[in-house]
Amino acid sequence: MRLYIDPGTGSMLFTILIGAISSLVFFGRKLLLKASFVLHGGKAVKSESGDRIPIAIFSDHKRYWNVFQPVCDELEKRGARAEFMTASSDDPALEAEYQYVTTRFIGEGNAAFAKLNMLKADVILSTTPGLDVYQWKRSKYGGYYVHVLHAANDPVTYRMFGLDYYDAVLLSGNYQIGQYRALEQKRGLPAKELRLMGLPHMDALAARLQNAGTETHEGRNVLLAPSWGINGIFSVYGASIIDALLAAGHHVILRPHPQSLTSEKEMIDALRAQFPDSDRIEWNFDNDNFEVLRRSDILISDFSGVIFEFSLVFDKPVIYADTSFDTGPLDAWWLDEELWTFTALPRIGHALTKEDLPRIGEVIEHCLTDDAFAKARAEVRDETWVCRGESAALIADYLIEKQKSLTAPAGMPEEAPAPQAS
């Protein structure tokens, strides 16, 4: 005897099965987190003196020290007690010498999150999305969670619900306020505190460039720095784009995304074998991208944050790959308007297509000599990089005043915060 299950019932049973499996997975993950917490001390993270931390800063990777160092420097200048916590054992922050700001390694992965989930701090600053969505949970001991951007583009391009459980988000452009308010309205979220504070890492990059002086070289240096994945330039164009650049007579600098060295190792190894280092080609894997950006005349990339650093800080043209962009998993999926990034890129650069490859030399010269691109860079800079040169100081003052307001005894007057409200 055969049993028949109609499609509707089958679908329902399948949904129930998936739900049960998901519940078991999340329950198991919760047990692992608790076990990890016990194994790594089983205590709430407090300051080294044992008190509640006034200002805590968390970085999930050493690459974000360029975002936090300017802020830590400003907190140090003000004599504000703060603790910087990193999930990278080789974070440059651990070598910093401060009197008032403490830096420490709190473990990697779940070990770090287990400690953060028991954090005792008044204000917590981070650039990591996904708070209270993935392993990192809001501490049961409270705290005011503040997110700072690490790229000059749309904050709604984080994975869905990326910033939902932060109390405040520090932004770099007015358009971002409109995006986030629209997102809150669409999803029925309570309005969070949005403040225009700029981009500390880009301010620091600009100051470094000003102090570095002029760099000169012969010919054209073309930097090819794609992101990784199936829509990345190397995946879409392969060796053909490198051949085209060499045929145009340029010096080509190839800088793969760090993730490519792991996820696309076979492809990168094949390209390195086909195009070894020479007087015409160089592969660049520097941790710090400042020098390679400074000595490049033009950048070819895709939807990577480096496009805006190169264009807006170094004031140079870009060519961006015209590849697909799926908003399905992102907060941007909820919005009706086009992302700001896609309105900015056509103004500051040229959209690369396969038809451009035979004439890539002409495209490069056009981008380098057309004054319209330079004018557009100034416009885009004003749109997405406010408070230039002041960001770290503004953020430090904001954190100090926020901590004071949260801990002020009832009935006591509070000092007015910095005038950067949304």
Residue ranges and their predicted role:
Residues 37-53:
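N-terminal signal-anchor transmembrane helix
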Residues 54-206:
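Active-site and donor-binding regions of nucleotide-sugar-utilizing enzymes
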Residues 63-79, 200-271, 350, 354-357, ...:
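Conserved catalytic-core segment of nucleotide-activated headgroup transferases in glycan assembly
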Residues 86-100, 247-283:
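Catalytic donor nucleotide-activated moiety binding site of glycosyltransferases and closely related
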Residues 266-308, 313:
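Donor nucleotide-activated moiety binding/catalytic core segment of transferases
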Residues 388-422:
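C-terminal alpha-helical cap of glycosyltransferases
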